[in-house]
Amino acid sequence: MPTIQQLIRSAREKTDKKTKSPALKSCPQRRGVCTRVYTTTPKKPNSALRKVARVRLTSGFEVTAYIPGIGHNLQEHSVVMIRGGRVKDLPGVRYHIIRGTLDTAGVKDRRNGRSKYGAKRPKA
């Protein structure tokens, strides 16, 4: 425990917060081009084929981003928008592709939570 005199002499050091999404460079979203679209398997105890894409961003980074929702239309050279947000059971995947923007179509026949998947309101 420092004395008040010691604190006057040199103040406490601020700890720098490390960002969880460095490729975004403090922006809410970033645009990028898919370099590879593939499936990968999650960590134990889960089992699935998760859809992911390798994306080259305008910030110069190349990152792995998750493609949420059922079915997608992405392929190599698709232009996508990514946001932060990791996928807990896929190591190294720290970004999500935003559905319904640029070349990414929204999820078809989606009725609940539509805004998260870029789906339009269904006709009554």
From Swiss-Prot:
Keyword annotations from UniProtKB, A to Z: Methylation, Ribonucleoprotein, Ribosomal protein, RNA-binding, rRNA-binding, tRNA-binding
Database matches in Pfam families: Ribosom_S12_S23
GO terms classed as biological process: translation
Residues in the signal sequence: none
Modified residues annotated as 3-methylthioaspartic acid in this record: D89
InterPro entries: NA-bd_OB-fold, Ribosomal_uS12, Ribosomal_uS12_bac
Residue numbers spanned by region Disordered: 8-28
Superkingdom assignment: Bacteria
One GO molecular-function entry: rRNA binding
GO CC field: small ribosomal subunit
Compositional bias of kind Basic and acidic residues: 10-19
Family annotation (NCBIfam families): rpsL_bact
Protein family (similarity comment): Belongs to the universal ribosomal protein uS12 family.
Function: With S4 and S5 plays an important role in translational accuracy.
HAMAP family according to UniProt: Ribosomal_uS12_B
Subunit field text: Part of the 30S ribosomal subunit. Contacts proteins S8 and S17. May interact with IF1 in the 30S initiation complex.
PANTHER family attached to this UniProt entry: 30S RIBOSOMAL PROTEIN S12 FAMILY MEMBER
Stated name of the protein: Small ribosomal subunit protein uS12
